Amino acid sequence: IYQPTSGQILLDGVDITHLSITERANLGLSYAFQQPVRFKGLRVKDLLSLAAGKNTSVNEACSYLSEVGLCARDYVDRELNDSLSGGELKRIEIAMVLARGTKLSIFDEPEAGIDLWSFQNLIRVFEKMYEQTRGSILIISHQERILNIADKIVVIKNGQVEKEGARADILPALLGSADAGSPACSVLADK
């Protein structure tokens, strides 16, 4: 994780700039990596329990797995090892974020390694999170398709904020530009 060279990172008015990942998580921030971390030796249910901070029942674990498009009975007792594909690991990681129920959920290119059918399911997961969330969802993506579910879009180019505003204001200009492939951060929920 890079340390910022200037500025602050605030979460609910609290400066979290120099806090560890664990300290940030304890304040209600979750992060799903572009390349999911492999927790070898753990079962999927155990990982979901760790994420939730409590012993998750099989029914709860199955609910989280079903929400991300995995057949729960095939995964709940499965070990996290090299037999899982990148897309499966990505979905399990998103299920972990759902289990945590945090104030701010950050997803770094959640569509990476996921096929088109799963991508549509992923969009539905984010829409459901948006409807049920008490916090905010931040999605970092290069995919135009994911921008359609954003409330707010922030376009970052060469490390600087280039454009920021409501989807209705930013998306038409972004899609019409030659730089439509620029990275964009989409804030879905800001409650």
Task: State the predicted function of each range.
Residues 93-94:
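Hydrophobic anchor residue at the start of the ABC signature
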